[in-house]
Structures are given as C-alpha cells and as structure tokens.
C-alpha cells in the first residue's frame, strides 16, 4: 500500500552555485558519503548532486515532514540496489517517521525515479508499506 508520495524539481544551476560558493562544506553537510562517492565520479557532477538533492526533498515530502521539520539532509540518502535501481535509505528521524507511517506487519520501501535535462533535475518518490516477508530489497535500516 502507498503511504507517501513526493516530487521535487531542482535547478541544477542552484547546486552549481552552492558548490562554487561553499565547496566541500556544502557537499558534506547535505550529502551522504555514498552520494558523494557516486556524484564525484560523474562527468556532470552538479547534475548528479542536483538529482540526489531533489530525491532527498521528494523523500522528505513523501514522509510528510519536509527537510525543515525534523528530518535532516543526511538522514535521507540515495543508494542503489544490486540491480542498479535507485532507492532511498532512511536513518535517524527519517527512519522513525517512515516506520511510524508503516502499518503493523509491514515494512517501508521507497520507489524512486530521478532524471535531469539541464537546467532541471527531477525526482519522484512513492513510499510503500510492504508486508513483512515480501521480497525486501530496498530501504536499509541503519
């Protein structure tokens, strides 16, 4: 069952300017180590970060909190399943919120899609409650 839905549209130029202005301080404050390792290898580095930024925002909207209301940037991270498909990893208060939305006997899983077409990056998140024991290949608890 669907327990949350979120979307976000991000201007890649905004991320480019933040990286130029604040450098590693911005990147380390907003992005997980996994996201940094993935994005820093990309030719279109700012676009990669912008997609992840949009996914974090969309994930926070799917949780019903937004980033400012109790969930921090690094508590939502874009990770890839063994198949390469992206999903979200929730930690801390984001994980607590995901679990609070999830009915008894179920576990949360985030379906996401991210894309970019300069100057835009976009993300959609569908947060699903899956019955426990269903093939679980996504949301890591940590």
Swiss-Prot record:
It catalyses: apo-[ACP] + CoA = holo-[ACP] + adenosine 3',5'-bisphosphate + H(+). It holds the Pfam family ACPS. GO terms for biological process: fatty acid biosynthetic process. It is found in: Cytoplasm. The keyword Membrane does not apply. Mg(2+) binds at residues 8, 57. Its EC number is 2.7.8.7. Keywords: Cytoplasm, Fatty acid biosynthesis, Fatty acid metabolism, Lipid biosynthesis, Lipid metabolism, Magnesium, Metal-binding, Transferase. Its main location: cytoplasm. GO terms for cellular component: cytoplasm. Its cofactor is Mg(2+). One of its GO terms (molecular function) is magnesium ion binding. Belongs to the P-Pant transferase superfamily. AcpS family. Transfers the 4'-phosphopantetheine moiety from coenzyme A to a Ser of acyl-carrier-protein. This is Holo-[acyl-carrier-protein] synthase. The lineage of its organism: Bacteria, Pseudomonadati, Pseudomonadota, Alphaproteobacteria, Maricaulales.
